[in-house]
Structures are given as structure tokens and as C-alpha cells.
């Protein structure tokens, strides 16, 4: 009997849906979850964020960095 192939369950974008959080550069607690411990933006294949929302997220993180709300790099 052949083994059943393993299918990885597709993750759902955390920013889509009715009561999903809005991406805002002032919300540093939300943005902090999408930054690695070194200060880099985590890719969407890991966080399961859609392409459109990943672009919004990156823009918000860069804006927050420019305004010194988030660090550019962590030592």
C-alpha cells in the first residue's frame, strides 16, 4: 500500500479578514513581530503575509525606522 503524500497546510494572511489589525507605522508592537532579532524584515514565506500586505508592512517598518520608532539594526 502506497503512503499518503504529506501536504503542508497553507497559512492564512494575518492581515486579511474582518477583524484583522491595520498596518500602521505608529503601531510598533505589531511591527516588532515582523522584524527578526537582528532588526531585519522577516520574509512573507515565513510569516504567511500576502504580497500586498508584505509591501505595506515593509513600507510601515521603513517609515517607523526613519522616524526612530524602530531600530535599523540590533547589535
Curated annotation (Swiss-Prot):
GO molecular function, one term: structural constituent of ribosome
InterPro entries linked to this entry: Ribosomal_bS18 (IPR001648), Ribosomal_bS18_CS (IPR018275), Ribosomal_bS18_sf (IPR036870)
Pfam families for this protein: Ribosomal_S18 (PF01084)
GO cellular component entries: cytosolic small ribosomal subunit
GO biological process, one term: translation
UniProt keyword annotations, A-Z: Ribonucleoprotein, Ribosomal protein, RNA-binding, rRNA-binding
Organism domain of life: Bacteria
UniProt keyword Protein biosynthesis present: no
SUPFAM superfamilies: Ribosomal protein S18 (SSF46911)
Subunit structure: Part of the 30S ribosomal subunit. Forms a tight heterodimer with protein bS6.
Biological function: Binds as a heterodimer with protein bS6 to the central domain of the 16S rRNA, where it helps stabilize the platform of the 30S subunit.
Similarity comment: Belongs to the bacterial ribosomal protein bS18 family.
Record-linked HAMAP family: Ribosomal_bS18
NCBIfam families the UniProt entry points to: S18
Protein name: Small ribosomal subunit protein bS18
Organism: Dinoroseobacter shibae (strain DSM 16493 / NCIMB 14021 / DFL 12)
Amino acid at each position: 500500500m502506497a503512503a499518503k503524500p504529506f501536504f503542508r497546510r497553507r497559512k492564512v494572511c494575518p492581515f486579511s479578514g474582518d477583524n484583522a489589525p491595520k498596518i500602521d507605522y505608529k503601531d510598533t508592537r505589531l511591527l516588532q513581530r515582523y522584524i527578526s532579532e537582528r532588526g531585519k524584515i522577516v520574509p512573507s514565506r515565513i510569516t504567511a503575509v500576502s504580497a500586498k500586505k508584505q509591501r505595506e508592512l515593509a513600507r510601515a517598518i521603513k517609515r517607523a525606522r526613519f522616524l526612530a520608532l524602530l531600530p535599523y539594526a540590533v547589535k
